């Protein structure tokens, strides 16, 4: 299965989106960016998955798809999704969390991860 990275984002500025884009650009990782403030279906998907409109939410999808290739691990009700590795999904990560998640999914190789 060919994997693709999809980032759910919004058009207005967000520090976590900036961090994620910086890491993805640093490693030359291609990704598709879906803007939840322009796409109502994407907005609803994000609410279903995360419980919040938290961006960025990154998913590993099959090539050409917009949804995770496998069901993300569930979140405890009311728990913030920030930085929690849910397998095929990661929301609002810091740079270190994102690098570890990307390494786990073989998008990059990071020493010590």
Where are these regions (language model features)?
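Local sequence-structure signature of Cys/Sec-based thiol-disulfide redox active-site neighborhoods
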Residues: 1-32
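Conserved short-loop catalytic and cofactor-binding motifs
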Residues: 8, 34, 46, 86
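Conserved residues at beta->alpha junctions
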Residues: 11, 37, 93
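Non-catalytic, surface beta->alpha helical segment in thiol-disulfide oxidoreductase systems
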Residues: 62-112
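Thioredoxin-like thiol-disulfide oxidoreductase module
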Residues: 36-54, 59-65, 100-105
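Hydrophobic beta-strand residues in large extracellular and virion-surface proteins
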Residues: 5-7, 58, 98
């Amino acid at each position: 299965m060919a994997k693709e990275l999809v980032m759910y984002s919004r058009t207005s500025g967000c520090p976590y989106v900036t961090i994620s884009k910086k890491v993805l650009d640093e490693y030359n990782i291609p990704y598709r960016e879906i803007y939840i403030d322009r796409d109502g279906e994407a907005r609803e998907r994000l609410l279903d998955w995360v419980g919040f409109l938290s961006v960025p939410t990154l998913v590993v999808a099959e090539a050409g798809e917009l949804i995770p290739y496998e069901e993300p691990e569930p979140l405890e009700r009311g728990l913030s999704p920030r930085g929690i590795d849910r397998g095929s999904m990661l929301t609002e990560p810091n740079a270190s969390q994102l690098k570890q998640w990307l390494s786990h999914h073989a998008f990059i190789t990071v020493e010590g991860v």
